[in-house]
């Protein structure tokens, strides 16, 4: 039997969602550039869905927003939660209209896996645990990046960058035996070194989301 030249199959992919909360594109650009400066490898080239639930202005210039994002090497695959006029703009721009939450049919949740790294993560290295948690038995050095769609556990010193809940999981946590991170992020909310030091009284810690803000808790010795 001859193999068909194409096949259409169902599948699921993890996409990051960029929430636009302001109609001021200059403000959006400024805040976006600050995030890109912190972790460019994490954002650049990654497929994104733009959530427009906070935009109710029917005259909003979606084309200008698309140009702003693509000029920074962000890959926009579609929009979600937009009013009708913006959905029509999206169609003319070749963007998909993506349904989410109650609008979409429920998909079976993939089993969460754990990626185990039994060595130090050195400067310039990046480790990504897709659809699961990341456990590092060792030190994450300055200039190294550890990323997980789930939680991150460091049984050693965290000196580099740790980004948990990369696909939007707000229940993810970052735990480190010694917390000296350059940056920590959970579901897009981030702290730099100064924030960590200002909110922590011990070296070890568990960072999690409390509402829309990060918080750190001491670990029992």
From Swiss-Prot:
Q: Which keywords belong to this entry?
A: Cell cycle, Cell division, Septation
Q: Which GO annotations describe the biological process of this protein?
A: cell morphogenesis; division septum assembly; regulation of cell division; regulation of cell septum assembly
UniProt record similarity statement:
Belongs to the MinC family.
- Indicate the quaternary assembly: Interacts with MinD and FtsZ.
> Tell me, what does this protein do in biology?
Cell division inhibitor that blocks the formation of polar Z ring septums. Rapidly oscillates between the poles of the cell to destabilize FtsZ filaments that have formed before they mature into polar Z rings. Prevents FtsZ polymerization.
According to UniProt, the name of this protein is Probable septum site-determining protein MinC
